[in-house]
Structure formats: structure tokens, C-alpha cells
């Protein structure tokens, strides 16, 4: 197998992952590039248990049984690896947005299975996003998803803090969007408590003092960050036909992730390999019904 997995082209990747055995071998090489290492005792020899759909590797020293998918978004799933890899490859491309209907058609699974796969991936992305605070010169503002100046349906307007890190040359190096609460929604003002909560949670302590506009009606509509939020709203509406408050944060995190990966990864294949590793862990996602679907 090719040694440098992060330099794979799309064509080579499809050729490499042509069946389940090839996908299993690929995942093994990603997990243990220099050969098996027991995650419990670091012993380097194992016997293979091949009676399951995916093999287990039992350490010859401590008898711990290691799985290839543990800690990844594929953990606990009955969906074939080849279908998972196809989904992850599409999501690894920065400008390729998929909804469940489109994914179900691409990998030939039910809508329910496609939705649960995407949900597990988005949940992992969201946790990864929460673990990466903004650094440096951080600026932000209060925006509203679903806002319309003359709309009577205030409950459909979801307040979101939109913030980004600014590089010395003025460009955006990282974007973050987090839902928030307003003490008095009609006033469209972010409270000091919520303002500080965002900073404490999502801005690195080593950063400069963040500048966040707490007053929605004082925002200039030509502001670059405000225009970025409008692009996100269009993406949500055009790709997913609108998102309710229950899952909105996951989709906001996905958009920010897509925006930020251009600074984090050199290629789609590098990101694809990262998707397959436990860094994007889903082991603590407690969704029994979804695990049965995916």
C-alpha cells in the first residue's frame, strides 16, 4: 500500500478503496502505520479475530481486543466502510455540501441512514470546533438567522455570535459561529453575561482583548463579518432548505469547519485521512437509535 496516505489523489483513492477488504487495510494502515501497537500496553503483536464483519486485533500480551473504528465516526456502525469512506471523501472537499437526500443517492442507502451518518460526522466536527478557540485579534458581532425586518415570527429568529480571527494583513484566518440567548430579544442586544461567556469559552486566553459588537442595530450592513453571516444563511437555506434551532449549531459548526480547513489542511485527501482517525471522535455520542441506523 502507498505509504504517504495524505497525498492520495481522488482517482487513486477510489482505486485503492474498491472493496471492503481494501477499506479495512487502508484503515489499519492509518491506525497503525508501523504495525500493530496495543492501545493498552503498547505490545506490538496481535492475533486477528476474523469472525466479525470487521476484524478485531487481540493483543498477545494483555488480550485487549482493538477495533479499527473505535473512537471514529464509524464506530458502532453497520454501514459498510466503503460507503462511509465515500461520504467522508465528499465532505472532505471544502466546497462540496451534501444533504441527506443527496448522500443517500450517492452511496445507495436509506434517507434515515444517510441522515444519521451526517449527524454523527457533524457532531464530531462540532466537538472539534469547540476544542479550537479563536486566537490573536478577535472581532465579532451579533447576527440573527431567520431575521427579517418586517417578519412577525420572532420565535424563528435565532441569535448567533459571529466572530473571526484577523491576521496582520487583515484577512480572516478562522471563523466561529455560536448560538446564544438574549435577555430581551426585542431589543436585539447581546447581554454582557453572554458576551463574556462566548469569550471565556471560544477565545484563547492569550488573545488580544476581543472586540464584539453587542448591538445588532448598530452593525453596518456592509461589514465583512455581517456579509459572511448572510452567506451562511444562504448556504443553510439553499442546501438544506432551512434549519430549526434544534440542529442549527451543528450546521453552523460545519460551515465554519469548511471555511477553516483551507488554513488547516493542504489537500482534501489529508482531511479525508484525518476524518478516518479518532481525532474526530464520536465514542461519547449517545444516540442508540442513530447507531442502529448507521
Locate predicted features:
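Residue-level recognition of single "structural anchor" positions
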Residues: 1-294
